[in-house]
Amino acid sequence: MNDSGYQSNLSLLRVFLDEFRSVLRQESPGLIPRLAFYYVRAFLSLLCQYPNKKLASLPLYRWINLFIMCNVMTIFWTMFVALPESKNVIEMGDDLVWISGMALVFTKIFYMHLRCDEIDELISDFEYYNRELRPHNIDEEVLGWQRLCYVIESGLYINCFCLVNFFSAAIFLQPLLGEGKLPFHSVYPFQWHRLDLHPYTFWFLYIWQSLTSQHNLMSILMVDMVGISTFLQTALNLKLLCIEIRKLGDMEVSDKRFHEEFCRVVRFHQHIIKLVGKANRAFNGAFNAQLMASFSLISISTFETMAAAAVDPKMAAKFVLLMLVAFIQLSLWCVSGTLVYTQSVEVAQAAFDINDWHTKSPGIQRDISFVILRAQKPLMYVAEPFLPFTLGTYMLVLKNCYRLLALMQESM
């Protein structure tokens, strides 16, 4: 599991579909091959977007990673410089959407470059239940929840991978049907972006932007999947914690033995709390970028859809697609964040449901009461200094997008 070399990651991706199908074919819940985290990390490594200690020790890998980030920043600036050339509000909106998207891509891959070693530690921390608490678990309820989470995560990867490839094809094929433009409105030195003046250079740039777009979309998809898997695995661990707490009430043992088992479960709870704090620190920059980009992308694409509907239906359809992508992306973050929020407060109910806990010794009753009190403070993934990823934040973002949309309509 700890071997994260380039060849081992390639081998892991080769067996992904076989392992996924083997889990789907299980008639009763069994052990999962590995956490779905490892597939995403392997894909990021193959994209040269995961320079952890082991891969960064390879000079070629390190230089490729730096080249990729420089390439993204270069394309961002060519798009930014082209912004004054926009002829109307529709073209300007199109440029702003892509500039926002490219800024989001760069921010996320930059933070992945900085935090990949911390993410390795997080992935290892999520193995705590199987490694420390219950290394040889055969409980069908626990195995069933682990299997369900594995299937959801892996299925999400597969479906998002297909959707992103469709979106990528729409980006670089659409200009071919138009006026011979680059996939992104850009300005290059010596007017290399002009098909009539530099046809060979134009087609080189066209292919280069298309390949960069495909690589960027795959990269941001996998970075997002790391974050969403962090949310889902946290919710799963909290669910397993609730199961372990409730099972304590079924134990017919002495108070001393009960207290030993209870302390093991409490250590698991403390581990989850610390894990959420570590994840918030590791992903904070990416969380902030996600909230700001979601707000801008939803607002601009919705406004441009309405502005272009009567003038340019093709552009309107393009903005609808961009709006849906932004909605889906924000929805995934907020729904999975809400799972963590709701499951963390369920721990208090699980502790209260321990059978006959009021008949235990005063020390045990005090410890259980402390767990109930602590669990009433929900665990949240927060984009500090902004809001947590919950459905409440989702509705707040949509409400503010609507207000901004109304303001832009009035200004026209």
Curated annotation (Swiss-Prot):
Cytoplasmic side: 1-74, 125-169, 251-302, 352-389
Coiled coil: none
A GO MF label: odorant binding
Keyword Cell membrane in annotation: yes
Assigned keywords, A-Z: Cell membrane, Membrane, Olfaction, Receptor, Sensory transduction, Transducer, Transmembrane, Transmembrane helix
Membership in a protein family: Belongs to the insect chemoreceptor superfamily. Heteromeric odorant receptor channel (TC 1.A.69) family. Or49a subfamily.
Record PANTHER family: ODORANT RECEPTOR, ODORANT RECEPTOR 19A-RELATED
Protein name (database record): Odorant receptor 47b
Source organism of the structure: Drosophila melanogaster
